Amino acid sequence: DTYETATARQADRAFFVRPGTDGALALALLHVLEKEGLTDEAFLAAHVQGWQELKKDVLPRHTPESAAAVTGLSPEAIRELALAYGKARAPFIRLGSGFSRYTNGAMTTRLLLALPAAVGAWKKPGGGLLSSVPGSRAFSKDIVQRPDLRKNVRLVNMCEIGNALTSASDPPIKSLFVYSSNPACTAPDQKKVTEGLLRDDLFTVVHERFLTDTALYADIVLPATTSLEHSDIYAAYGHYTIQRGEAVILPVGESKPNWAVACLLADALGLDDPFFKKSEDDLIDELIASTDAWPLPVDKAALAAGLPVDLPLPENYKLDFKTPSGKIELLNPKEEPPLPDYFPAHGDDEPFQFISAPDARILDSSFNEREELSRGKVMELLMHPDDAEKLGLADGDPVVCSNERGTASFTLALSRRVLLGTLVSEGVWWRTYCKGRCGLNMLTSQRLTDKGGGSTFYDVNVRIERES
């Protein structure tokens, strides 16, 4: 990780790297695995495309010593980690999402996926790599998304909503409907997002349960139901588990679920397709029926009864690689470069790397409505004591972090949980709790990842000074 989290404190051994350098560490681990004879050559020959090329053209440049200069880990620590991983009975990597939130995030993903391939982890019970395995893959999403009803429309990346609302476009965005989101708080480049939301010619509707930061900019706020007030079908985020949920209370007041609002809008717009006459339960029934396409039979009776259902998996599912070659493609001629390699993240021209980490009390900006949070540690900034001493800063000082996009105020907390040169603030707090209504996303960028159009929330540098 990039700093000592609560999870790291529970570990037998923890390794902390500079933000955005996971790819350099992965290559050094592969270098050691190959040198120490800990690779599974039979698995590599049968199931991996490009190992020999990677070993010949890339790995020699990425020694533990070179990676130490990049990651901040010692060469000895890198070797220790490589040997432990290579000798494990069931080498397993659990990936979060933080490593991908840099401009080199996609490349880092390619490099991390090379590790279980190198040691043949996929063939071992309990071995492999897990990022996200949403149970929603069991459903046909076309049932709800209905691509056949859509005309060709412009798609706007949510990570670039600030630019989309403020730049001259043809046609310009004149209306904004916000649901299940709070972009005034959670979107990057908060200053630009706010500038867009303040436009006099932008008509904004927010469908919400609480008066969020975004709702404060709305022309109309529509009350939304909670999960207790509407039926739905749920898919686990990290398990192959799905479950039908029924409403347990009637909608409060005029609250309506997303689907009901969509149907009412369709009716008001004169859209008469039968799709918009279906109920939530109709759609849920169709989604459950679509699980017929899952590789093995799904217990529909249990689903209908509202029980959690684990999706059955084929015996060899871990070796069924969904690529053109049917192998793990370390070498992919369609990619540039064809072989994975490390390159630094973008960052900014400022001295400190800034990480906006999760806080266990909230999820993104959800649960900010809890009154006790306004009395807790909000907008606290973790800094290594040695860095603070050099700048003449003390624990508890009011400080300001700045870069070309904006500024945000914090209370300084000195801690050896963070690395030298790194600052960490936990939690995406409603701007109501932030000085000057400036949250930490004043500092984050609309830059996108190298593939996939993902966010780069952690690829940020700032300067810091005592607040006057």
Residues covered by each model-derived region:
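Short beta-alpha connecting loops at secondary-structure transitions
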Residues: R9-V17, T225-L228, Y240-V252
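Phosphate/diphosphate-binding loops
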Residues: V193, R199-F203, H207-F210, R244-D267, ...
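Extended redox/cofactor-interaction regions of prokaryotic respiratory oxidoreductases
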Residues: G23-L27, L111-Y217, T225-I233, A302-L391
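Long, well-ordered, tryptophan-enriched scaffold segments
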Residues: Y3-A88
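Long, contiguous, secondary-structure-rich segments that constitute the structural scaffold
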Residues: V252, N258-A302, E371-L382, D386-S468
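Glycine-rich phosphate/diphosphate-binding loops that line cofactor/substrate pockets in enzymes
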Residues: D57, R79-F92, G162-K174
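Flexible, glycine/charged-enriched surface loops at secondary-structure junctions
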Residues: T39-L44, F92, K124-L130, D273-E280
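Conserved short loop/turn motifs at secondary-structure junctions
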Residues: A69-L73, G96-T103, S181-P183
